[in-house]
Amino acid sequence: MAKGNPRKRAAATKDKWKMKEWYVVYAPDFFGNKEIGLTPADDPEKVIGRVIETTLKDLTGDFTKGQVKLYFQIYDVKGQNAYTKFKGHTLSRSYIRSLVRRRTTRVDGIFNITTKDGYKLRVMGMVIAYRRIQTSQERAIREIMRDIIYKKAEELNYKDFILEAVTGKMATEIAKEARKIYPIKRAEIRKIKVLAEPEA
């Protein structure tokens, strides 16, 4: 089967790249409108919808936050600038594995919440307790997670809720209350997913 001239194929590929332009991608305002990457396209419409991954360390310069992965989706392009909205976050698998050791107990909680200004989110919390704990203690810790997360959703708008979750402030409050039940190693908001935005 004829494959065509390799030089022509290479030239065609090169021409396609020549037609593309680079767009500078920016984080939302509550993450400081910081530049988070570059993305190429031959049409600005093709940039819309792309998801850019970065870390909280890259945004803040805090080297202790490299495990916090942030996802931003491009929704608007003006000139060579692409603007994003927060899509979700996760903790790296390697970081979670480092917390969960033998003779510890991992308590997970998954909560669908609505922020004060109407954003619907799925929030996944996690508490790591030293040693094995009783089922009743697990249940009590999960209740603490739920109560704090729901209370925050009632009190905070979307932007403030996200910031408290990804920076660790919310997890610190969970840890403080959970320690009244049993000594714990760590509390984390391990994942957030935006389910729906309020109707305009």
From Swiss-Prot:
<keyword id="KW-0689">Ribosomal protein</keyword>
<dbReference type="Pfam" id="PF01015">
    <property type="entry name" value="Ribosomal_S3Ae"/>
</dbReference>
<comment type="similarity">
    <text>Belongs to the eukaryotic ribosomal protein eS1 family.</text>
</comment>
<dbReference type="InterPro" id="IPR030838">
    <property type="entry name" value="Ribosomal_eS1_arc"/>
</dbReference>
<protein>
    <recommendedName>
        <fullName>Small ribosomal subunit protein eS1</fullName>
    </recommendedName>
</protein>
<dbReference type="GO" id="GO:1990904">
    <property type="term" value="C:ribonucleoprotein complex"/>
</dbReference>
<dbReference type="GO" id="GO:0005840">
    <property type="term" value="C:ribosome"/>
</dbReference>
<dbReference type="InterPro" id="IPR001593">
    <property type="entry name" value="Ribosomal_eS1"/>
</dbReference>
<dbReference type="InterPro" id="IPR018281">
    <property type="entry name" value="Ribosomal_eS1_CS"/>
</dbReference>
<keyword id="KW-0687">Ribonucleoprotein</keyword>
<dbReference type="GO" id="GO:0003735">
    <property type="term" value="F:structural constituent of ribosome"/>
</dbReference>
<dbReference type="GO" id="GO:0006412">
    <property type="term" value="P:translation"/>
</dbReference>
